[in-house]
């Protein structure tokens, strides 16, 4: 009988199995309970029927029940039938469960075949248990099984996911010994892993190695390398590969162009991004919504709203319909440039087109109107948000609270915070900082101090801003001793103000102890 290596199973796997078997014992699975009363032949027929009719749409619990039913069948089903069920469970990403079930099979003396070993190795790799996968590979080879290209591919993916690239490259080099010639997919797996790990020199070395062996790189190879090089600012190398790609008549597709445009945008290289867009059009590659969103986002980030709006209009004229991300990007750009009315026009257009704004959309507009000093309009946008069924989040309330406090409406802000505390929403330190600052600004130091002292009781830990705000408030009132105590407590909690915060907040009010602590923090 084949014996697999001993495995320690996680508590979650043990818990699931325990609960499942309890249900079976209590008879909560009528299908399984009914099957127990059948004869062996009837039971055999029942699971075979389920294998034939249910596997294509089976749910996880049902697949697990089917496996248990098969274990009880006599004669015991073949390894092929067991593997069919376990393949389905593995596709549900229940890798620990698959490993557990294989050991249940082993305990019944069911011998594994190449395919079942391969699935088990795949599951070990996906669970980041590479040492067990390698031990199992050795075990199966001792039993006379020769690994397939799928087996080796699973190991290769496992090495790359575990950042064990030397072993990945060694595995590729040794594939000839197993009778397999690594193809472009195998090399792409290694190159992709190296690029994600920013090990670009080794990625290029693997690329040149595959070229020497006569394996032609494809669009995926070039896309991975060029994106990785561009993300690391190696524009010369990226451009050289791009020229090489074009020379070989490997046509870049929309995904390739979009990824590269997005990289240039993130690097702030808008000229190259725009040129790539023109190259797409020249090559008759049709840009998609992601392409336009990347370009519009880049123009908005760098304050080129005219270019962003032009690209938006061009997008529409070419029959590519903007999505919520497109509108949110433009609305944010307009609001940051203090053109909130233009942002609102876009919001109305978006609604007219049948798109529903999300919390981000409304938060952007509310913030824009608050910054413009139009609290009443911000309140109307908030009301519309609620009426449209979009739930305000803590960011929404923080924006409104900040606006109320900045406009001297501290009483309204306090009522809103009280309502928030009664709701199920988690009130964060940012919320309390806004209120504490508002109270200090309106000479309500006593109320601010009470709120500050209650934070720990509310399960919220004060941060540096909370401390600085209170120390500044105490200093302005001439309460030097209390300020010194709080400064000492701030240091004990591991917070020290930056030089900028000190300059802006404490310089005019510092006490001797405050000055000493701050000086020590920056030596």
Curated annotation (Swiss-Prot):
NCBIfam families: PPR. Keywords: Repeat. This is Pentatricopeptide repeat-containing protein At1g64580. The keyword Transcription does not apply. Belongs to the PPR family. P subfamily. The lineage of its organism: Eukaryota, Viridiplantae, Streptophyta, Embryophyta, Tracheophyta. It holds the Pfam family PPR. PPR repeats lie at residues 43-77, 78-112, 113-147, 148-182, 183-217, 218-252, 253-287, 288-322, 323-357, 358-392, 393-427, 428-462, 463-497.
